[in-house]
Amino acid sequence: MKKKFIKMLCSIAIGCMISTSYSIKVSAFSNGNTKTNPNGEFKSLSLNSTNPYKTKYSFNDLNKLSNKEILDLTSKIKWSDISDLFQYNKDSYTFYSNKERVQALIDGLYEKGCNYTSTDDKGIDTLVEILRSGFYLGYYNDSLKYLNDKSFKDKCIPAMIAIENNKNFKLGENGQDTVVHALGKLIGNTSCNDEVVNKTIPILEQYYNEIDKYSKDRLKSNAVYNFMKEINYDISQYEYAHNIRDYKNTPWSGKIDSFIDTISKFASISNVTKDNGWIINNSIYYTAKLSKYHSNPSIPHSVIDNCIEIFPDYSEQYFTAIEAIKEDFNSRDSKGNVIDINKLIEEGKKHYLPKTYTFDNGKIIIKAGDKVEESKIQKLYWASKEVKSQFHRIIGNDKPLEVGNADDILTIVIYNNPEEYKLNKTLYGYSVDNGGIYIEGIGTFFTYERTPQESIYSLEELFRHEFTHYLQGRYLIPGLFNKGDFYKGNNGRITWFEEGSAEFFAGSTRTSVLPRKSMVGGLSKNPKERFNADKLLHSKYSDGWDFYKYGYAFSDYMYNNNKKLFSDLVSTMKNNDVKGYEALIEESSKDSKINKDYEYHMENLVNNYDNYTIPLVSDDYMKQYDNKSLHEIKSDIEKAMDVKNSQITKESSQYFDTYNLKATYTLSSNKGEISNWNYMNNKINEALNKLDNLSWGGYKTVTAYFSNPRLNSNNEVVYDIVFHGLLSHNKNSNEKVEVKEEPEIKDKDSFENVIYEKENNDSFDKANKIHKNQIVMATLDTEDYRDTFYFDALTSGSIDITIENIHGNSDAFNWLVYNDEDLNNYIAYPTKKEDNKLMGSFKVHKPGRYYILVYKTSLNKVNYKLNISDATNMAPVIKKIHEKENNDSFETANKITLDTLVLGNLDYKDVSDIYSFDIENTKDLNIKLTNLNNLGIAWNLYKESDLNNYIAYGAKSDNAIVGKCNLSPGKYYLYVYKYSGDKGNYSVIIN
């Protein structure tokens, strides 16, 4: 089973919520207010903030006040005047554990809700934030779990209705807008009923009628947005908590039609502007999400259909509607017609990312918008080499922790601008409420070009940060993000280090890591406001964004003043020593000397701010140099570094060729870990300096590192050393770069068009899986003389196979095809030879698994491309998934959807699989179970109301078990079982 985990390592949050519609959408549903620290979202909007007594309060102060005094105080202070709001400590526990006090605050909100005016919010904004802080802490802390109980949250509903019944409940003066905004936030942290929901309609109508004016008003816009987001959030949480499958049976079903219809009105605004685009997007999103609670879901569904017609192709609104059709309506329009969503998405990728660049023999691929300058693409490549060189020096390892992961090939997706980046959520399915994001499970990070007005961080800075996350996942932290041991039980255990060190390594140069002016400028000038070591070392994403800057400062402190701590931390990570790491963190967070030195280092950084710059790659990388032979370069580097017997290899990129020189360096004496490191660091830098002083300018592109320290048989310390630099420019450097057109995708499976083989695949049981119309890049050499691949044929037909020797002729290798049922006798071989290609075809007489064996027939190394294609008409486009074990009981059944092809397998231990699916409307369904191997298999269908008696079964038809049945609304279980045969694969589809 293939698992994908998202490394959501975002460099920079996109600021204003209403400036980015997709960021609104993602945070609205994925990041409910109970899961994120909400007090960083806006500055206080309370009007009456005069306070003659104090400028700041803490829960310690509030605990000394009576309930009446607290309620009076909320009218005099801003919520930001409470220093530890949303923070769990003994004082906040004391405050919120007093149920009578919390109830008094809720009662106070009711009274204030009855009495606020158009110009005086009566402190409602501050009081709401105090209440939200309690519900937030109740979500995360069992000691306050009563605050997370829905029955207690419902106690806020009378106060909400009181606010809505006040004659001043409308958009207008600042006091009114503040109250409306606060109500929306409170709904998200508590609950709502249909009355609360429907009483928000006048606000939505008012905003709709004045949209040209109000869309320019941030407070009014956020107030309206909160109603959409938080009401949907509360309903979806109820749905999740009660395992709702019949959406007609909820407290809101059929009771909030007018609310949904009012939201949907915004989706029909065809005149999109920079001010109203966000609410149109959100209207599309929430209309689709809430449609299932409408008494006639086809009404909001048809609104989404209309969006596809009225908005321009490739526009943000168009793709928002496309995604809604896919996610909320099973890729069908309101009349039941299937829409080929995958085709539209692929067209969108080609539109927004028409350029493809390759580097390092295809190990780095950049997909970019047509407005991203090609010179910047090249500079990003060289920036990666600077970051990589310093990372490996400090981490001390350049061997991948796991072989065969997706990050064997790094893919970088760069959109033209922030506006186009919003489409990434639809085109690739990943969050866009950030400046960039690395997805470790697919070895890809996404970002966008930006102007100084759009971000204080340049594209190269962001790239350096995200590239560090790639290096962390590949060389430092075992396991995939959020899945490895360091994330178990506490997924924020190393967050401060991942983000802080990523900001640190973004300052890498050829010889060191320099302070970044953009980071130092974010450190508070007031020492009391800075993170101390204890606070930083326990920081998580839920704590906001500030820990990025202080994590950077701590990494810079370790690099310059405490290399031993830096080394100890990375050693625990490389060794997967979670307990050792936790012990080191606890010790360091309480070490007064570490904290003092860290704070002193921060003070020096702040004081020297004007002396810093932002490290970026030099223009030396972009200059043209005379060609120099590998032999000459090898000789010069060996002389500069005082080594012999190095190995130098060439790698090709789109614009230039580069080289890697590898050797070992043995220390004359062992002076301890840190002294050895300092010696090697100086030695490498001295070699780079010597090369710089030679006449050939290409040496100014050289980066180098040392890693993997170890003792040899003579008890001497040995390091691996690696030098990388420019070898020569190719013709693309002097002409417009040719854009690589994406191959036409005929098979809409969600697979990459170009993949690389994963060793070891030299036997049938280790074969790599491939797909039709996929290009496989692979290599055969003296140690790897054969490769095997397999594919599953779901129907009969003719298969074409082409294998091309990239750098030689077709006499150097051969291929054969085998059927899974007989691995001793091949069934096909090449029948046509054309220059460097071997081609052939064979007839698939019945569905099943087929293997391709590629083997060498000469002593030469062979780099080849393999492609298989279907010579018959392509099968209908369908989505494919794989079963997930254990699914052998009704309780553990895999949930599937209609029109999805499920691939499963059975063997002597696993003799049955069970799947569940939901039917919303009475319909006729076809069930087809296809035997991909020589198994005796069958299926039965059960309804949830009677799991003892099946209601349908299949009949044999060729190599499939098929059946047709008429099903009424409800939940059903498909029971697939084996009655003969050893082991094999099958596919099943319900449509």
Swiss-Prot record:
Regulation: Partially inhibited by 1-10-phenanthroline; inactivation is irreversible. Partially inhibited by EDTA; inactivation is reversible. Inhibited by broad-spectrum zinc metalloprotease inhibitor batimastat. N-aryl mercaptoacetamide-based inhibitors have been isolated that act on clostridial collagenases with submicromolar affinity while having negligibile activity on human collagenases.
Region (Collagen-binding domain 2): 878-991
Region of interest called Catalytic subdomain, as start-end residue ranges on this chain: 340-611
GO molecular function, one term: metalloendopeptidase activity
Region annotation S1 metalloprotease domain, degrades FALGPA (furylacryloyl-Leu-Gly-Pro-Ala): where it falls in the sequence: 53-727
Cofactor binding: number and manner: Binds about 5 Ca(2+) per subunit. The metallopeptidase domain binds 1 Ca(2+), while each CDB binds 2. Binds 1 catalytic Zn(2+) per subunit.
Record-linked Gene3D superfamilies: 1.10.390.20, 2.60.120.380, 3.30.980.50, Collagenase ColT, N-terminal domain
Residues reported to bind Ca(2+) 3: E759, N761, D784, D787
Biotechnology: N-aryl mercaptoacetamide-based inhibitors with submicromolar affinity for clostridial collagenases but negligibile activity on human collagenases have been discovered that may lead to promising anti-infective drugs against Clostridia.
Residue sites binding Ca(2+) 5 per the record: E885, N887, D888, D910, D913
Active site: E466
Subcellular location: Secreted
General function of this protein: Clostridial collagenases are among the most efficient degraders of eukaryotic collagen known; saprophytes use collagen as a carbon source while pathogens additionally digest collagen to aid in host colonization. Has both tripeptidylcarboxypeptidase on Gly-X-Y and endopeptidase activities; the endopeptidase cuts within the triple helix region of collagen while tripeptidylcarboxypeptidase successively digests the exposed ends, thus clostridial collagenases can digest large sections of collagen.
Comment block on domains: The mature protein has 3 domains; a metalloprotease domain (S1, approximately residues 53 to 727) and 2 collagen-binding domains (CBD) (755-872) and (882-991). The metalloprotease S1 domain is composed of 3 subdomains which together resemble a saddle; an activator domain (residues 57-330), the catalytic peptidase subdomain (340-611) and a helper subdomain (619-731).
Protein family (similarity comment): Belongs to the peptidase M9B family. Collagenase subfamily.
Protein name: Collagenase ColT
Origin species: Clostridium tetani (strain Massachusetts / E88)
Higher taxonomy: Bacteria, Bacillati, Bacillota, Clostridia, Eubacteriales
